[in-house]
A protein has these predicted regions:
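Regulatory N- and C-terminal appendages and interdomain linkers associated
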Residues: 1-21, 62, 134, 169, ...
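Conserved kinase catalytic-core segment
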Residues: 124-188
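A broad, structural surface signal
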Residues: 64, 68-72, 139, 143, ...
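Short, solvent-exposed coil/turn linker segments
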Residues: 9-14, 107-119, 222-241
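Short alpha-helical "patches" and their helix-cap loops
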Residues: 80-88, 158-167, 271-272
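ATP-dependent phospho-/nucleotidyl transfer catalytic cores
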Residues: 91-95, 100-145, 269
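C-terminal catalytic region of ATP-dependent kinase domains
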Residues: 73, 168-272
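Conserved ATP-binding subdomain of kinase catalytic cores across diverse folds
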Residues: 2-112
Length: 272
């Protein structure tokens, strides 16, 4: 599977202006963003977590893994590339791994967060999950909850789900994006904690639509329609080409997390 979605040769991206800064729930540090081009040529760049001293590459590797895993599952998503690059931040040069992605909006579409859309169109007493069902998005949300469970994603707040508004007045849920704060990202490369991490731990998540429990959310929507099954080989494929980017210990644990969680999903699905 390794190919055009990983750029190993060092790229000089010191010309990028990292003028967009965002913090993610539960993280220590800032995520820096940049962009080039416009319209169909618009490219977004995203650095992993930066605390003013070091850059942690885990989130960007996770975005690529999630992108590849959703390819295997047949889930619509934003495609990410993983790029080895030199960047300039606050006058200091860093060598790191970062993500790039393209604009997923069609011509004339506007985007707004699901939270903002909910505030505009919700009915009295309506909860986000009920709201999404009313708009016919229940299968989109179910597929999102499946990938969030498999990736142990801790951050699916309202701004990490977008609605796209077309000129004809119709709306659709945007392809899934921002799955980086997942797997081992919160452990910041601590090998002792990585080794000890329970692959089935019900990690708390910030989730606008569901609860703080990823497994509870999955049980609510299982069985998930419109996804392909995984086996050991198809789970291994997304890790192609990642050798040397993260430690072998981390990559093996990440693969174990996805394998064990898919097996748990199969158990949940079989009980329905």
């Amino acid at each position: 599977m390794a190919g055009r979605d990983i750029v190993r040769s060092l790229q000089d991206l010191t010309n990028l202006d990292w003028n967009e800064r965002a913090s993610s729930s539960g993280t220590a540090g800032t995520y820096l963003k940049a962009r080039t081009g416009s319209g169909s040529r618009l490219i977004y760049y995203k650095l992993p977590r930066y605390n003013g001293v070091v850059i942690d590459s885990y989130e960007c590797v996770n975005e690529l893994l999630a992108s590849r895993l959703m390819d295997a599952l047949g889930i619509e998503h934003l495609a990410y590339r993983l790029i080895h690059a030199k960047v300039l931040i606050d006058g200091a040069e860093y060598e790191t791994w970062l993500n790039s992605s393209r604009n997923f909006r069609k011509v004339g579409e506007r985007k707004l967060s699901l939270g903002a859309f909910f505030d505009l169109y919700k009915e009295p007493g309506e909860f986000p999950m009920e709201f999404c069902r009313r708009f016919g998005w229940q299968e989109d949300i179910a597929r999102m909850m499946l990938i969030d469970y498999l990736m142990a994603n801790r951050d699916r707040r309202a701004s990490n789900i977008e609605v796209l508004a077309a000129p004809d007045g119709s709306f659709r849920i945007a392809p899934i994006f921002d799955t980086g704060f997942s797997l081992l990202a919160p452990l910041a490369g601590d090998l002792e904690r990585i080794t000890a991490f329970d692959p089935l731990a019900d990690v708390a998540t910030t989730n606008f639509v569901g609860s703080r429990s990823l497994e509870e959310n999955l049980r609510t929507v299982a069985p998930v329609e419109g996804v392909k099954d995984l086996d050991e080989a198809r789970i291994a494929e997304p890790f192609d080409g990642l050798e040397g980017i993260l430690s072998d210990v981390a990559l093996l644990k990440m693969r174990e997390i996805i394998q064990r969680r898919w097996a748990r999903y199969e158990e949940i699905r079989a009980d329905r």
